[in-house]
Amino acid sequence: MSKPRVLYISQHLTPYLPETTMSHVSRMLPQGTHEKGKEIRVFMPRFGKINERRHQLHEVIRLSGMNLNVNDTDHPLIIKVASIPSARIQVYFIDNDTYFKRKAVLEDADGNFFPDNDERSLFFVRGVLETVRKLGWAPDIIHCSGWMTSMVPLYLKHVFADEPYFDKAKIVYHAYDEGFEGALDAGMAAKAEAHGIPADALSSIAEPTFDNLNALGMKGADAVIVGSENLTPEGQAVLAGLDKPILPYSGSEGFVAEINAFYDEMLEGKTEAVAE
């Protein structure tokens, strides 16, 4: 029997960015999953704040070179990779000079949210899925962490609907309280619609706030993991109304075993038993 395959798509990951709850889990969970006998692939954005020399990132030429159109402009997709020696795992980075070269993450030096963070999110999501397809690697579970990954379910359902590499994958959305104030560019839905996602599927992000994007990810996934002790009130309300497997927040210890048991239940079709 082949090993289960888990694709991790994460907004933040240590040691490449400062540690938060999300970046810590996104670092330790893939390692633990690998140690439990599953195959993994890990993707994150190559934010310009990441020190390429220190972490020994290098470009994967055979995976780079595709152009992704966002907002009527073609942007070259660059794929880089690095290893975490202590974990014996590789991390793939989605890169592009327009979106990720700036020496920052999501905000400028004055704390202002970048006005193109919506496009950066769309480029990241599509870049990951296009790269996984190019790798010819079919995941059983796609684990999404952070609001930047909230569009993954819609892209899989509508843009990659006929892609055999994804047709059996279960989507897990890991919901955190690590968000932002205000809203992304109001044209985000239209930009995603141009990729082939129906307008009615995007109506909830006519105003792309953190809560609306988080809700989109939770509603579109096959299962939800709660990654923060306290989600926002809006997030809690969405969670309470979901009719799907949910793994409650369980603290900062023991999550590898709990989440992998959740994976196993999902793959065996028995998740209702752990969805309290």
Where are these regions (language model features)?
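Catalytic cores of nucleotide-sugar-dependent glycosyltransferases that transfer UDP/GDP/TDP-activated
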Residues: M1-E276
